[in-house]
Design a protein with these regions (language model features):
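Arginine/glycine-rich "motif VI" loop of SF2 helicases in the C-terminal RecA-like domain
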Residues: 26, 119-125, 146-153
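Short, well-ordered beta-strand core segments
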Residues: 78, 100-101, 127
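Inter-motif core of Ras-like GTPase G domains
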Residues: 85-108, 114-115
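Conserved nucleotide-binding/hydrolysis micro-motifs of P-loop NTPases
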Residues: 40-42, 108, 134-137, 163-164
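Conserved C-terminal guanine-recognition region of P-loop GTPase G domains, centered on the G4
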Residues: 112-133
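P-loop/Walker-type NTP enzyme "switch/lid" segment
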Residues: 2-12, 19-92, 166-174
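Beta-strand-loop-alpha "switch" segments that mediate conformational coupling across diverse proteins
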Residues: 135-136, 145-175, 188-192
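Short, aromatic/basic amphipathic alpha-helical patches
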Residues: 46-51, 141-151
Length: 193
């Protein structure tokens, strides 16, 4: 199962989402779990080095070859943290995806970036949006949820703005974050109907 975490825009929560999804998979013990850091910035690897995830192997390398090799593992759950943009690594990962998780924020230019990511995703691959760092109870969030609903884009999760979730390698993964991303993981790995 290849879960690709992607958005053409940077700074939307891709790394946080990828790390939490891999941690959830590792805790479920459903076979080998591989977390691929395909972003040249190396934030996923930095996070992993500071706080290794139980049951999760890290693969570093922002190259098409490295990503492809990692995603060819038959029995593994592979979570790929892609770089922003539409580069060859992103396209290669999306081309091998079994599910695409698209982290985004509420408001701003986010919808056009998500639509660009969806346009690069193969039609037969399930994809869903996760609104990260959401300010609960705001008009921006309500409008964003309404937008995705009207466009029939699956909303796989809303992750509220919490320092404990988005603090990166500075602290351990939060239980709240693990619970929220467990729901995203369940949607990403659901059998198509």
């Amino acid at each position: 199962m290849n879960i690709v975490v992607s958005n053409v825009k940077g700074g939307v929560g891709k790394t946080t989402t990828a790390v939490y999804l891999a941690a959830v998979a590792g805790r479920r013990g459903r076979g080998p779990v591989v977390l691929v850091d395909a972003d040249p910035q190396g934030s996923t690897a930095e996070w992993y080095d500071a706080d290794p995830l139980d049951g999760v192997e890290l693969v570093e390398g922002p190259s098409v070859r490295t990503v492809g090799k990692a995603m060819n593992q038959e029995d593994a759950i592979v979570v790929v943290d892609t770089p922003p943009g539409e580069g060859t690594v992103v396209q290669a990962a999306l081309g091998r995806a079994d599910a695409v998780v698209i982290p985004t924020r509420a408001g701003g230019v986010e919808p056009t970036r998500v639509m660009a990511t969806l346009a690069m995703t193969p039609r037969n691959v399930p994809a869903g949006v996760v609104i990260c760092s959401a300010r609960l109870g705001t008009n921006d969030l309500d409008a964003t949820v309404e937008w995705w609903t009207e466009l029939n884009v699956p909303l796989w999760g809303i992750v509220p703005e919490r320092v404990s979730i988005a603090s990166g390698p500075a602290s351990a993964l939060s239980n709240e974050g693990l619970d929220l991303y467990a729901k995203v993981f369940k949607r990403a790995t659901a059998k198509p109907r």
